[in-house]
């Protein structure tokens, strides 16, 4: 097993690439599925990674706080389930039900979406602002500055980015280093 580094050249202010992925609810989703929203919080995450598990409740809180404001979470699992069986579609469905996910949890089964975004870790967040028929990247990176303990967070990068967009302002910190487990790729 070799871990693929970022192959994408997705930068801030770029148009996000579209996708067509199946969610744990059996529905197929693309960026067009969320055309009515002002922005999207795309989170590459998974079941098995301890970092992703530490952030799971915070991801749920982001959706609870921002979905009503037009900024929902979309979670995408990029790992190959043959390498990490805990990240199989069936286990994703079980996890989504157990944790009461309020957002779509999608499988990047062919592993062709995460490289286009340049995701390298789980979790890795991309905040996309909807500008007509385009979703423009406004933030890339970590959820916050403390994966170990939510009560010790000093910088809430994603919340700060979304709050700035909601206020019509520039995102204060546009990019941070994603902290998490490397994405497990079947071709590397």
Q: What name fits each language-model region?
A:
Residues 161-188:
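Cysteine/selenocysteine-centered motifs that mediate thiol-based redox chemistry or coordinate metal-sulfur cofactors
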